[in-house]
Curated annotation (Swiss-Prot):
This is Antimicrobial peptide 143. Residues 44-73 form a propeptide. Expressed by the venom gland. It is found in: Secreted; Target cell membrane. Cationic host defense peptide that have antibacterial activity by breaking membranes. Is more effective on Gram-positive than on Gram-negative bacteria. The keyword Cell membrane does not apply. It comes from Lychas mucronatus (Chinese swimming scorpion). GO terms for biological process: defense response to bacterium. It comes from the Eukaryota. The modification Lysine amide is found at K38. Keywords: Amidation, Antibiotic, Antimicrobial, Cleavage on pair of basic residues, Membrane, Secreted, Signal, Target cell membrane, Target membrane, Transmembrane. Belongs to the non-disulfide-bridged peptide (NDBP) superfamily. Short antimicrobial peptide (group 4) family. Residues 1-22 form the signal peptide. One of its GO terms (cellular component) is other organism cell membrane.
């Protein structure tokens, strides 16, 4: 039943996209449909940004060390 509803929504959006000539939405729509059928959940945004914050902190520390070791001209 869930798959039938998703396919119906997919077909409606497909017709609307073709009518509006918004074909660039179709790859993301197909990917979302596949994810919904497989039952994957979206990742939390917080978990995506935490590693980047660590990288920024590491870079900042490296830059501070670099500037501390540079001679003054």
């Amino acid at each position: 039943m869930k798959v039938k509803c998703l396919l119906a929504v997919f077909l409606i959006v497909l017709i609307a996209a073709e009518h509006c000539q918004a074909l660039f939405f179709l790859p993301s729509l197909i990917g979302g449909l596949i994810s919904a059928i497989k039952g994957r959940r979206k990742r939390e945004l917080g978990t995506q940004f935490r590693p980047q914050q660590k990288n920024f902190m590491r870079r900042e520390i490296d830059l501070e060390r670099l500037f501390a070791e540079m001679p003054d001209y």
